[in-house]
A protein has these predicted regions:
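An acidic-aromatic loop/edge-strand motif
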Residues: 127, 142-147, 157, 162, ...
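Active-site-adjacent "subsite" loops/lids of carbohydrate-active enzymes
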Residues: 122-183, 187-189, 193-201, 205-231, ...
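Short, surface-exposed tryptophan/glycine-enriched loops
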Residues: 228-231, 856-857, 895-909, 913-918
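Mature N-terminal segment immediately following signal peptide/propeptide cleavage
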Residues: 30-76
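Carbohydrate-binding surfaces of carbohydrate-active enzymes
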Residues: 23, 28, 46-47, 60-63, ...
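Bacterial N-terminal signal peptides
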Residues: 7-15
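Short strand-turn-strand beta-turns centered on an Asx-Gly dipeptide
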Residues: 205-210, 881-888
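Aromatic-lined ligand-binding clefts that engage carbohydrates, nucleic acids, or primary amines
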Residues: 194, 746-747, 855-883, 891, ...
Length: 1016
């Protein structure tokens, strides 16, 4: 099919001819219009090839990569800086190479995305913030200063600088220092600036003439700035192998404990000590034991950054190169000036043309809670009360109910500041230049984690951070692969759906192997539709792009374009209880995960929604809740929650009065919040308008309360997943079999018109059989092979549709190509029957394996039939020649070619090349080019074993429960939904996350067969 011109594309999307381009806005074409672009979609929608720039970059090498990508159907090139990138980041020589990339891509009709920084997280400008704008660096609130005194003793000394709160508690045993203290010279002016070198954590102890010692925790890469007392006797540093004492964010509650209870309380209620008005701290400890006086301070502290432009070349991730103060719009403006405007001077004429936009990565607050100079002022404006008197209690442990509510107010305020002062200005800057801001947050797979870092502790609110982002995304570092349950891609897809964006990005893609295709399909069916093909690294031997990768590239491009046009069609909204997370409600997270998995496994499509959406910017009318994509929700499911916003409660009541369905599943909220969490609305909420299911499970009763499903299988299967989008006059469904068994079902689909199979592999469209029903549904026979995906469209049959799809299931085997083959893996040919490389003792082989077989056909070939070559099992990229005639490459089942025109009577020669990328061509995910997730790496929940026979709910599911329960108490073998604990020490555990580090299922490689020539 000829490439579409820009004019033709505008004809396909006439409503947007004068608006933003189709890749930036939700478009709803007709079936005929979608069919015109299916075989050759607009290239902006193409699979992204992630070019990892590590070491010395040359135009010659980069040009070879661009040429290779383009020759294999690649459309989009992403610049990604890696360790010791040269020329130096943002230097004239570096920007000249960037311009070269843009120019070469433009010549070929390709597009470019630019990584926003030189490493990650975004915000440190390759070290320029530390170098030129340290006053705009990231700041935090930490409980980092401690003074241990004996019971009954009195102390008096100058208050440590920048103190916000003070508390005292019974002292815990101090961790032993790893080495003797090193003396630090006492500064003549009293201003100590001491740098903690990379690789260690430290304590700096300042002792005065009275023997009173204050210990300050210092993280690797941080500079300690303090004013020491005039009577200072000594200063020394010690290295702490166990990390900084205390520090971190508030204890428990919203953030989860970060570094313990802020000050190492040994038990009992902490004593809150008022800040002295005169700056001189005076206190007498109660009798009995030692006391730890903890000073909660605001200071410059950065999340660790990996600066690929630094002197260590990104090898170390520490706090040396500070990120900006994300809560300060002035800092964001400087960041734009340092980085984005530097690019604009060189390639700005291609902004919104060849350059589609900017990518960000994992911007967050790691190990401390946010501070900015205007925090207290902004807090009082929004909440109506002063935060500072509560700060000490926020960090002390145990928490009082009042301090937990104050902490939730604090999270509410700073998460909004993060959105408004960093993310929104970056997106606005991009949109003003017809580009988009694209990226993912940190820990999206772990929403709340009392024992460590999480989305809520580090970034406040997933939904607020991504509220204005043009292309929200996820990071598939190692969380997704066969045998792993990881549903968290749904939250990024939901962020795009509810905010009116068509694309959802994924940082770590699959490769060009069958396992890579599983990773793509797994994400596509969960709504992620802008996928990476794993990186082009500096070393050619680690290049994840195969010479014959065009089949995978075209499959990804066609499928993700089809999944980006039209309007999302889920009718169910699953409430995401971020407000309850701020109050430390971990059960809310557990139940949210459980319901998400059960809905997916039982073909009930949904989007996550949050309080801001339901309570504010969704339109509410007689049809239901309408999001910014124009999608309408007919039901809202609310999992276990502690709190509900008054605005949400009021609108849910109106929604129910209009005929909408509201279902509370699990523990119902007992607190209603209007302006502040500190002072909630009196009384419990009236939920009489809703259905309440206390079990915390998707039961038959819950299903009965939901709208009529758009997909219903005649026989249940928790291994068939789907997603649904609506066109102007038709419906688009993607189905994916996540098991290794062939599954056949009759499926009832909402829609009217001709049922069609849209083949993303070759871009063809075929009519399918279907029986229309009077209720506006169609009964469709659906067979899905092992890990197979299919795209079904219902609507008018396009003019460019082909004949009905041919199946070889009933074909006649004309020749069985059994016996010996000539097999060449490397230099020495073998004569052997077909077996895996592992069975041949070549399990580590990478590259191209050549197979040759001569076979005879009957003297009289069947008349009126087509001849098909079926390779059987391959599990890698396969390319064939029959009697010297080339055929296209195939990268996944089924490995079948129509070879009618190449076969002759008598002797024939078949040549097969099987190719696999070298392991290590990309990060994580398993499979060729990736390598499995390491034990202890972050990952998805490992499936607890083979699904039960027939893929139906197991017998031990409680009566009335639809599918297997999910949770720590679930029995082993309880189906795909069970087992939330870590499988191999991984840290993923949040919404769709779970135990991690499980390697992908082992798959034998090579041509295994059986190989058949079939007449059909």
């Amino acid at each position: 099919m000829k490439k579409l011109t820009l004019c033709a594309l505008m004809c396909l999307f006439p409503l947007l001819a004068s608006a933003a381009p189709p890749w930036q806005e939700v478009t709803v074409p007709s079936v005929a219009e979608a069919a015109q672009s299916f075989a050759s979609p607009p290239r902006q929608f193409g699979a992204i090839h992630w070019a990892v720039w590590g070491g010395q970059q040359t135009k010659e090498r980069i040009l070879a990569d661009i040429t290779n990508i383009n020759a294999n159907g690649g459309c989009v090139y992403m610049i990604n800086n890696s360790q010791r990138v040269m020329p130096k980041y943002l230097s004239p020589e570096y920007l000249d190479i960037v311009k070269f990339v843009v120019d070469e891509c433009k010549k070929r009709g390709m597009y470019v995305w630019i990584e926003g920084d030189c490493g990650y997280p975004d915000g440190f400008a390759g070290g320029l913030i530390t170098q030129d704008y340290p006053q705009l660096g990231q700041q935090g609130i930490v409980a980092d200063a401690h003074c241990i005194i004996a019971g009954g003793k009195s102390v008096s000394f100058p208050l440590p600088s920048d103190t916000l709160g003070i508390y005292a508690s019974q002292a815990a045993a101090a961790a032993p220092a790893a080495e003797a203290g090193q003396a630090i010279q006492i500064p003549a002016d009293g201003k100590l600036n001491w740098y903690g070198a990379s690789g260690s954590s430290y304590e700096v102890t300042v002792t005065d003439a009275n023997g009173v010692a204050i210990r300050y925790s210092v993280v690797a890469g941080q500079t300690l700035h303090i004013q020491v007392p005039p009577n200072t006797r000594s200063i020394e540093s010690t290295t702490r192998a166990a990390g900084p004492r205390g520090g971190g964010g508030p204890a428990g509650g919203a953030a989860g404990a970060r570094g313990g209870a802020g000050g190492g309380a040994a038990g009992g209620q902490p004593t809150i000590i008022p800040d002295p008005a005169d700056g001189q701290f005076k206190w007498t400890a109660p009798a009995g034991g030692d006391w730890d006086i903890t000073f909660v301070r605001h200071l410059y502290r950065s999340s660790p950054t990996r600066n690929d432009a630094g002197e260590n070349g990104g090898a170390t991730k520490d706090s040396r190169y500070t990120e900006i103060d994300y809560l300060d719009p002035a800092a964001t403006a400087v960041y734009l000036k340092c980085v984005h405007e530097a690019y604009e001077k060189v390639v700005g004429d291609e902004f919104g043309k060849t350059i589609l936009g900017w990518r960000f990565d994992e911007t967050d607050y790691t190990g401390f809670s946010p501070w900015t100079p205007k925090l207290l002022e902004t807090f009082k404006q929004q909440k109506g009360y002063d935060l500072q008197p509560y700060i000490a209690e926020m960090f002390a442990s145990p928490q009082s109910p009042e301090s937990q509510r104050v902490k939730a107010d604090y999270w509410d305020v700073w998460s909004g500041m993060f959105r408004d002062n960093f993310y929104k200005p970056l997106q606005d800057w991009c949109r003003a230049r017809n580009m988009d801001y694209m990226g993912h947050l940190n820990h999206e797979e772990t929403q709340i984690n009392p024992r460590g870092e999480s989305m809520v502790s580090n970034e406040g609110s997933f939904w607020r951070d991504l509220r204005y982002i043009g292309v929200p995304g996820i990071d598939n570092l190692s969380q997704i692969g066969p045998g792993i349950v990881a549903d968290f891609p749904k939250i990024a897809a939901s962020a795009a759906h509810i905010n009116g964006h068509p694309l959802v990005w994924e940082e770590e893609g699959g490769d060009t192997s069958p396992n890579g295709k599983f990773i793509y399909d797994y994400q596509l069916v969960r709504g992620v539709n802008y996928l990476n093909i794993r990186g082009l690294n500096a070393a050619p031997s680690r290049n994840g792009l195969l010479d014959r990768a065009s089949a995978m590239g075209w499959y990804v491009t066609r499928s993700q374009h089809l999944m980006a046009i039209g309007r999302p069609a889920a009718q169910v909204a699953l409430f995401h209880p971020t407000d309850s997370y701020w109050l430390g409600d971990t059960e809310a997270d557990t139940v949210t995960i459980r319901l998400q998995t059960q809905l997916i496994r039982h073909q009930i499509d949904f989007d996550h929604v949050d309080s801001d959406a339901l309570g504010s910017y969704f339109t509410l009318d007689s049809d239901g809740f309408k999001n910014l994509s124009g999608q309408v929700y007919k039901a809202v499911v609310i999992p276990t929650s502690t709190v509900i916003q008054k605005s949400v409660l009021d609108r849910l009541r109106t929604f129910a009065g209009n005929g909408g369905k509201v279902v509370f599943v699990g523990r119902t909220p007992t607190m209603v919040v209007d302006k502040t969490f500190l002072n909630p609305v009196p009384g419990a909420p009236d939920l009489s308008f809703a259905t309440i299911e206390p079990s915390g499970e998707i039961t038959d009763r819950v299903v009965a309360a939901l709208p009529k499903p758009d997909v219903k299988l005649d026989t249940p299967s928790d291994m068939i997943n789907y997603i649904h989008r609506s066109l102007k006059d038709g419906e688009v469904y993607m189905f994916f079999n996540e098991s290794r068994q062939t599954l056949s079902r009759t499926v009832m689909l909402a829609g009217t018109g001709q049922v069609q199979l849209w083949d993303a592999g070759d871009g063809t469209i075929h009519p399918l059989a279907g029986v229309a029903k009077a209720d506006g549904t169609v009964a469709v026979p659906l067979t899905l092979g092992s890990q197979e995906a299919k795209f079904i469209v219902i609507g008018p049959l396009p003019a460019n549709a082909a004949a009905a799809a041919t199946t070889i299931n009933a074909g006649q085997t004309l020749v069985a190509l059994d016996g010996d083959w000539t097999v060449k893996l490397g230099a020495t040919p073998l004569t052997t029957g077909l077996k895996s490389w592992e069975a041949l003792g070549e399990g580590t082989f990478t590259g191209i394996a050549d197979y040759t077989k001569t076979f005879d056909t009957p003297a009289a070939l069947p008349q009126g039939k087509r001849l098909y070559l079926d390779l059987g099992e391959v599990n890698d990229m396969a390319h064939i020649k029959v009697n010297g005639k080339d055929f296209d490459s195939r990268g996944w089942p089924s490995y079948v070619w129509d070879v009618t025109d190449a076969i002759k009577t008598g002797a024939n020669t078949l040549e097969v090349q099987v190719q696999v990328a070298e392991a290590g061509g990309g990060r994580g995910g398993g499979g060729a080019g990736g390598g499995a997730a390491p034990a202890g790496g972050r990952g998805g929940r490992a499936a607890p074993g083979a699904p039960p026979a027939g893929n139906v709910a197991p017998a031990d599911v409680p009566a009335g429960v639809v599918g297997a329960p999910v949770g720590g108490a679930a029995a082993a073998g309880a189906g795909r939904g069970a087992g939330r604990g870590a499988a191999a020490g991984g840290r993923g555990r949040g919404t769709g996350g779970g135990g991690g580090g499980q390697a992908a299922a082992t798959v034998e490689r090579g041509l295994i067969g059986p190989v058949r020539l079939i007449a059909q």
